[in-house]
């Protein structure tokens, strides 16, 4: 419905301010296996720079594959810049990142756990939960997939009885974006680097001229711990409020506040087909059971709830 789309676009523009950009090619990467394959291929093709921002970078098989490949590209003259979160990578030994630095890669720890190492006001809960890979300022990967072997399995997993998080495949989704909107994602990376007082970046073509690669319209929306409210959340609430036919959400850590709860129930009440795909188990028992405490109200309000079996759902998507 064009009227609904126009209304949503106008609301987003008023709330966010970032442009809606035409000329992009968006490719759905439906699981960790396809995401890593696409990322590795793009990294190998990099000619100028690689910017990686990830909440978690683990010292496991996948993490070491990334490290080896990034170091190889750095040796070939491609500047690699990496941001990782101090809490997300708390179990990753310092030697892992020291090896990257020794190879010439610029590495920035977001909001170090040690307050004495912080270069700005220190707040323990200020975390960088982004997962962004940027190649030559023209290709971007965004979504829920961290750098960790738990995402390595494909999307078709066998049903298993165990729910141990270290033995169950994690189900997640990424997008590959080629085209002009990548410059907006690059700005988000640069903004984080600057606000965290990272070392001076090597002079590279971080914002090259970008040509249209497809016909997809894309708006990049970023939120940070410094923001007074989440722009992403406001966009989601407004989209649900404008929905007339269907709302489909997947969420790994679904603990709706009163506003989101009301938005979903109100949508179902006006005849919208509201469907939630949520985890059947989680790496956070507290969050899992807190989310389930809202099931009765949602179901009573006409919202349909499904639980993902056979894998640990980590996706956060909305249609």
Residue ranges and their predicted role:
Residues 55, 85, 252-253, 287:
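Glycine- and other small-residue-rich loops at beta-strand/loop junctions that grip anionic moieties
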Residues 271-273, 280, 284-319:
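C-terminal structural cap/anchor segments
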Residues 243, 252-275, 279-284:
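Helical hairpin unit composed of two closely spaced alpha helices linked by a short loop
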């Amino acid at each position: 419905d064009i009227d609904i789309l126009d209304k949503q676009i106008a609301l987003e523009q008023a709330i966010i301010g970032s442009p809606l950009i035409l000329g992009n090619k968006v490719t759905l990467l439906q699981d960790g296996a396809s995401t890593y394959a696409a990322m590795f291929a793009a990294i190998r093709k990099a000619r100028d720079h690689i910017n990686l921002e990830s909440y978690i970078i683990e010292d496991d098989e996948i993490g070491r594959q990334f490290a080896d490949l990034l170091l190889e590209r750095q040796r070939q003259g491609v500047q690699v810049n990496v941001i990782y979160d101090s809490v997300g990578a708390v179990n990753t030994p310092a030697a892992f990142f020291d090896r990257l630095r020794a190879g010439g890669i610029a590495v920035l720890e977001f909001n170090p756990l040690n307050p004495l190492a912080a270069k700005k006001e220190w707040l323990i809960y200020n975390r960088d939960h982004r997962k962004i890979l940027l190649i030559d300022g023209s290709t971007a990967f965004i979504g829920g997939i961290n750098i960790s072997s738990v995402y390595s399995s494909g999307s078709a997993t066998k049903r298993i009885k165990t729910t141990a998080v270290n033995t169950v495949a994690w189900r997640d989704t990424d997008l590959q974006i080629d085209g002009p909107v990548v410059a907006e994602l690059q700005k988000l990376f640069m903004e984080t680097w600057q606000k965290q007082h990272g070392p001076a970046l090597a002079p590279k073509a971080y914002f090259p001229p970008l040509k249209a690669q497809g016909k997809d319209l894309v708006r990049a929306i970023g939120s940070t711990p410094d923001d007074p409210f989440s722009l992403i959340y406001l966009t989601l609430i407004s989209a649900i409020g404008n929905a007339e036919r269907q709302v489909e959400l997947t969420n790994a850590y679904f603990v709706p506040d009163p506003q989101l709860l009301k938005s979903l129930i109100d949508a179902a009440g006006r005849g919208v087909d509201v469907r939630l795909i949520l985890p059947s188990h989680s790496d956070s028992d507290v969050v899992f059971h807190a989310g389930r405490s809202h099931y009765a109200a949602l179901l009573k309000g006409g919202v349909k709830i499904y639980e993902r079996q056979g894998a640990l759902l980590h996706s956060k998507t909305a249609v």
